[in-house]
Every structure is written in C-alpha cells, then in structure tokens.
C-alpha cells in the first residue's frame, strides 16, 4: 500500500535448477509463455551495440588483445582478455565501459568460462579515472579464479594497488560496485545469499566523472581467458534529497525465473510505473503509472507480452490509481485502489479486467487492495481507521464482500502496522506482513482472523508483501535491511526479492538483488505456470 508516512546463506529448499515451484501448468499457458519469453529476450532497454556501455578496449597494451560483446537476445556480455594483471603499478585488461558522473550502481553475475590457467585471473566491475594510463587511480570489485573476492583500489596515479579481501564472500557469483559521493561500496554474494559488504572512502583522485564498466584480466601474458556477465544492471540512483511521491526516476519491468534466478529486463521507461499483475493466460502484465503527465500518471496500463507495448486500460473516472490493484483468481475482474474521490483518500473499486465503470466497494477510507478469495466473494485489504477515542488512523486488515454488500469485517487489531494480506490459493489462509514483533515479518491467519501464526523470523531483514505461487507451495517476499524503519517500505532502496516454502520449513533464498522498493512487487505477480515472477526495478536516465 501507499507509504503511511505520506498518504498513505543460499539455503536449500528442495528446489533445484530447472524445477518448477508452481505446480500444474494451466492449459494453453505454457506455449504462450514459451513464445513470449523468446520474444521478450530481445526487448532489452539497452540500445547500443554494447548494451549499456559506450565502448570497449584493452588497457595497458596487453600482449594478447581482448574484446567485449553484447548479446541483445540473451542480455549477456562476454569479455575475452589477456593481460599480466590489475595490480601493483601496472594494469593490463579488457574494459567495457561508459562515462558516468556522480553516484552509480553496477551489478553483474560473473561466470568464468573453463577451468582457467592462473587461479588469479580476475573479472568484475570497475570505476577508473583514465583509460589511457595503465597506472590510473581506480576502484574495483574483483572476483578471482580461485574464488577470492576483494575490493581493490589505487589511490593515485603510479601508486601500488591496495585491497580489502572479503573471505565471507569467497566464491561469490554476484558483484555490485556502488558509488555514494566519496564512498565506494562493494557488495558480493553467492546467488541466493545476502550480500557481504566492503567499502573504501576518500579517494580524491577518482573524479566525479569517471569510466565505469566490466573488466577481465587473464593474469598471464600468454593466455586469453573468457568471462560471461549476466544480469548486468547499470543504475543511476535517485538524487540525494529527493521528495518521495513527488520526485521519481525511471522504471524497468523485469522477469525472473524463480528456480535459476535468471532475469531479463523486458521493458523500461523514463515514465515510472509500478506493481505488475500477470494475467492468468500469460498474455500480458498490468501495472500503474506513478509519474509522467496527467494522461499517464495514476492510470492503469496493459503491457502486451507479444508486442512489448503498453496500452491504456479504461477505468472510467478512476484515474488516480495507486499500486494496490489485484486480479481475481479467474482474471475476469480487477480490484483497484483509487484516489480520485473522497479527498484523495484511497478507495477500493472493482471493474472488468478489460476496462469499464468502477463499482465502489469500501465506504470507508483509506483502503488499500491486496487480495481476493479464490471464489471471488471477498476482498482482503488494509484499512486505516481511527479507533474509538483515538485521533490517528491505525492500519489493520479487513475483508468485505466483493459485491459491496454488508459492512467490512476487521481481522486484525494488534499494535503496529498490519499490511499486504493475500489469500492462499486453497482459500484457507491469509498471509500478511506485520510489525507486531517489532520488525516487519510475515504472518498468517485464517480467513476469520483467528489462528495467527508467525512465518518468518528474520533478525536482519524487514519482510513485506507475501505472494503465493499458483499451487500455493511457495511465497515470494521483498526484504529491506534494518536501516529502513520497519513500518515503512520506501522507494529507491537496496532490496532483495526472496522465495521460501509457504509452511516456513526452509529459510528464504534470494532470487534477485534489486534497487527499488515501493512499487517493486506490492501485488501478486507470479506467472500462471509458476516458473517466473515479474517485478519493477528503478534507475534514473543513464
């Protein structure tokens, strides 16, 4: 729901690569999705011949020349290089780069090809003052052939390289280098685990505008090595001091395979959008636009998988939709949360998925839609209500008949925020997130609000928005670090998209490391065959 501050270790879970945590494929759906993904692979936002990078070349004149390529269909970068090393006073390596000014985030999954000759071959992400000098100041996040991960840097031209080793991240597969003003932060993890962090500050010889990109060095002048970079995300973060719900940056629509963690960007826009819902036939995703001009902002859009084009959905007078919109299980209806009336307070309406005249369901506001029951008779939502004798809204979970009849029924009343309710596909449970323990964690209860049980017990993360796989065996959640206040889920933060069994029998594992948060995955977004999840990440224009 809308933020209340305004208006509103890889653990095995019996899920092996190639298996499907989602159960039975709906008739006709698998073919639609297979064709769709083959089409979507070519839908990357990276427009140039080298994707998000502007050029490539060898630094330091290595004996064996290298190259960099970008495969737009698979969204994969491949680098091949020789080079003595990136160390001491001389660097020799292949570099795919772009010039960037100010803060940035570059994330990549790194895969060396073959066993390699030297255990210290290295690849990763770098920011560098000069591409002409072999002894330039730089900072990099380096993955070595023997699994060593280190934050390496040269403070001044001609000086020796220094490094901070990260033993806890040994054999990492995901590297992320970030600049925050004068601070450089390296995050590294084996896919599935949370990041380990190292950082270095005060490197004045790495200027505000510098060369940023991917690198490879073979660590042997007579050998050429090759590395593949997958899931590369070049991100321009939001400016320091931005005002939430007024200042926005662009959005990327991504789809991740929940078994392998393989993810693709299928659409990107400078006009921000949020919260994708997947149609049951797999043909399209629905989302709301949160920015842009009045003809876009607050409107619902249908993103066609085959054409990769969004079209406007007619929602009548309801043209101030927020990111709490949910399809019925059969896909025939959509319940929206709109702020066009009632003094801009969020109100729940239903209408046909194809568009039409909204029917008001909740007489009381604010109300934020989150779940249908499988029989489409009830809506489950978060409501802000002023308790007897109180002055401020308390946010609890309610249900109301989907035809608008009768009074709403209050299901929770514990101190703190209860939010994000979603009904299991068998109709027996409501999963939700709550701060009743002091942190934001996942809980569940019966449809009558009884038999409340805790699902997650994370002491390092605040967990939000449980979403069920179609067979009800899995949930995805989005997790914030403890630096974020538990009852808040802000925009433009480092988050993790995680998956776990619905019964809590195994710990969550990471399937995507995201720069996003609010609007990333507020509503159900599993593919109908249970193999993929759609979500939104964010970046300003590069």
Predicted regions: what is each one?
Residues 8-10, 34:
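Compositionally biased, low-complexity segments
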Residues 2, 26-27:
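N-terminal hydrophobic targeting signals that begin at the initiator methionine
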Residues 44-243:
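Extracellular glycan-recognition regions
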Residues 14-25:
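Short, Lys/Arg-enriched N-terminal segments with co-localized hydrophobic residues
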Residues 239-542:
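Sequence signature of WD/YWTD-type beta-propeller architectures
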Residues 7, 16-18, 42:
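Low-complexity, intrinsically disordered segments with a bias for serine/threonine
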Residues 3, 12-14:
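Serine residues within intrinsically disordered or low-complexity segments
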Residues 29-39:
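Bacterial N-terminal signal peptides
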């Amino acid at each position: 729901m809308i933020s209340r501050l305004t208006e509103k270790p890889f653990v095995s879970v019996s899920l092996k690569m190639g298996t499907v945590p989602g159960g039975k494929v709906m008739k006709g759906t698998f073919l639609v999705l297979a064709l769709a993904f083959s089409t979507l692979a070519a839908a990357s936002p990276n427009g140039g011949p080298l994707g998000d990078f502007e050029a490539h070349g060898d630094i330091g004149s290595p004996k064996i020349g290298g190259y960099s390529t970008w495969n737009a269909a698979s969204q994969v970068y491949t680098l091949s290089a020789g080079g003595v090393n990136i160390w001491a006073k001389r660097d020799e390596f292949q570099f795919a780069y772009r010039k960037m000014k100010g803060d940035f985030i570059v994330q990549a999954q790194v895969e060396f090809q073959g066993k390699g000759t030297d255990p210290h071959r290295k690849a990763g992400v770098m920011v560098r003052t000069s591409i002409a000098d072999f002894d330039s100041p730089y900072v990099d996040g380096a993955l070595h052939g023997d699994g060593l991960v280190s934050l390496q840097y040269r403070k001044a031209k001609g000086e020796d390289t220094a490094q901070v080793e990260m033993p806890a991240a040994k054999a990492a597969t995901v590297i992320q280098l970030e600049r925050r003003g004068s601070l450089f932060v390296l995050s590294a993890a084996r896919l599935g685990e949370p990041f380990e962090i190292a950082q270095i500050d005060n490197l004045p010889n790495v200027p505000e505008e510098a060369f940023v990109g991917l690198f490879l060095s073979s660590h042997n002048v007579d050998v050429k090595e090759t590395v593949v970079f997958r899931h590369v995300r070049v991100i321009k973060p939001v400016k320091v001091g931005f005002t939430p719900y007024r200042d926005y940056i662009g959005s990327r629509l991504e789809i991740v395979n929940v078994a392998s963690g393989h993810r693709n960007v299928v659409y990107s826009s400078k006009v921000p959008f949020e919260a994708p819902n997947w149609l049951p036939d797999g043909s399209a995703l629905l989302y709301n636009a949160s920015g842009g001009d009045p003809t876009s902002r607050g409107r619902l859009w249908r993103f066609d998988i085959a054409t990769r084009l969004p079209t406007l959905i007619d929602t009548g007078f309801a043209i101030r939709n927020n990111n709490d919109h949910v399809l019925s299980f059969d896909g025939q209806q959509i319940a929206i949360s709109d702020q066009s009336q009632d003094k801009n307070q969020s109100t729940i309406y239903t209408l046909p998925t194809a568009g039409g005249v909204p029917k008001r369901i909740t007489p009381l506001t604010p109300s934020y839609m989150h779940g249908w029951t499988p029989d489409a008779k009830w809506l489950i939502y978060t409501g802000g209500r002023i308790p007897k004798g109180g002055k401020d809204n308390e946010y609890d979970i309610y249900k109301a008949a989907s035809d608008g009849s009768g009074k709403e029924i209050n299901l929770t009343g514990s101190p703190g925020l209860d939010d994000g309710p979603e009904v299991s596909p068998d109709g027996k449970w409501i999963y939700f997130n709550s701060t009743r323990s002091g942190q934001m964690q996942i809980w569940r209860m019966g449809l009558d609000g009884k038999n409340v049980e805790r699902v997650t017990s994370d002491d390092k993360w605040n967990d939000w928005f449980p979403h069920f796989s179609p067979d009800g065996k899995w949930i995805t959640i989005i997790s914030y670090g403890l630096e974020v206040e538990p009852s808040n889920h802000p925009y433009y933060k480092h988050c993790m998209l995680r998956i776990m069994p619905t019964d809590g029998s195994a710990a969550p594992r990471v399937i995507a490391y995201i720069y996003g948060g609010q609007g990333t995955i507020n509503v159900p977004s599993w593919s109908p065959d249970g193999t993929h999840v759609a979500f939104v990440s964010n970046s300003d224009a590069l």
